[in-house]
């Protein structure tokens, strides 16, 4: 948020904001817009010299009838179990195909306090295989036109140019900047806003159904506070 903004260095005659959202359902858009409002207010609370709105809201034109779902779990095992349950529910009860669904998480691995690495991809893959759910990984070569062979597993960086009818976001605890205060330095505020943007990016990739599975709550994470308050 403290980096040079392009529009301040380029002369232009008109500034046009595209607000109509033809891709996402009203339920998803309303949830994201609330997140935008809370995030923008919190950023201004942290730094009152931010000149522009960071997160822009949109206007939905259709409804899906499916509310955004937030699932609170205790640990990583519960997260993976909940992810598999959500996928099975979407396929068996809601009529989605596996290729309509993506599971999105921040990074490829997680470091524990003892220094060991938990490979979330491996644990999720094994659980999907045990449940006979087909899956594929997203990378830089995957586009919306790429034939999908099952549920897409992706980190936030690979998902940013894709869209899916249903997205399950998990492992947001892997984000580094969970809490911040006005007393923190500018670079810490900037890093926190960067993590908010990762969450925002993941949510904007979904069309009809969004589920967020987390073990943190609003007391332990400002990110989750902005998501659920």
Language-model segments: which ranges?
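Glycine-rich phosphate-binding "P-loop"
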Residues: 56, 60-79
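Core RecA-like ATPase module of SF1/SF2 helicases and allied nucleic-acid translocases
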Residues: 77-84, 88-211, 216-229
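Conserved beta-strand scaffold positions in the cores of enzyme catalytic domains, especially
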Residues: 13-17, 67-70, 153
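Acidic carboxylate-rich catalytic motifs and surrounding loops in phosphoryl-/glycosyl-chemistry enzymes
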Residues: 18-23, 74, 214-218
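Short, flexible turn/loop "capping" segments at secondary-structure junctions
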Residues: 9-11, 60-64, 94-96
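Phosphate/oxyanion-binding active-site loops and adjacent basic polyanion-contact surfaces
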Residues: 24, 28, 72-84
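Generic structural signal for hydrophobic residues
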Residues: 2, 32, 120-124
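Conserved coupling/interface region of RecA-like P-loop/ASCE motor cores
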Residues: 3-56
């Amino acid at each position: 948020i403290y980096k040079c903004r392009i529009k301040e260095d380029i002369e232009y005659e008109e500034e046009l904001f595209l607000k109509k959202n033809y891709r996402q359902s009203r339920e998803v858009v309303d949830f994201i817009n609330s997140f935008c409002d809370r995030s923008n207010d919190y950023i201004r609370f942290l730094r009152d010299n931010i000149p522009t709105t960071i997160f822009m809201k949109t206007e939905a034109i259709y409804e899906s009838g499916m509310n955004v779902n937030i699932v609170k779990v205790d640990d990583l095992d519960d997260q993976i179990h909940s992810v598999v349950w959500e996928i099975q529910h979407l396929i068996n009860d809601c009529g989605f195909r596996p290729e309509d669904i993506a599971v999105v998480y921040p990074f490829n691995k997680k470091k524990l306090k003892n220094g060991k690495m938990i490979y979330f991809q491996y644990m999720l893959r094994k659980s999907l295989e045990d449940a006979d759910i087909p899956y594929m990984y997203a990378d830089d070569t995957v586009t919306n036109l790429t034939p999908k062979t099952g549920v897409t597993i992706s980190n936030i960086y690979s998902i940013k140019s894709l869209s899916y009818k249903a997205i399950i976001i998990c492992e947001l605890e892997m984000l580094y900047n969970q809490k911040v205060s006005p007393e923190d330095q500018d670079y810490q505020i900037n890093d926190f806003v960067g993590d908010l943007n990762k969450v925002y990016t993941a949510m904007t990739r979904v069309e009809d159904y969004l589920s967020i599975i987390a073990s943190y709550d609003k007391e332990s994470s400002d990110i989750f506070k902005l998501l659920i308050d």
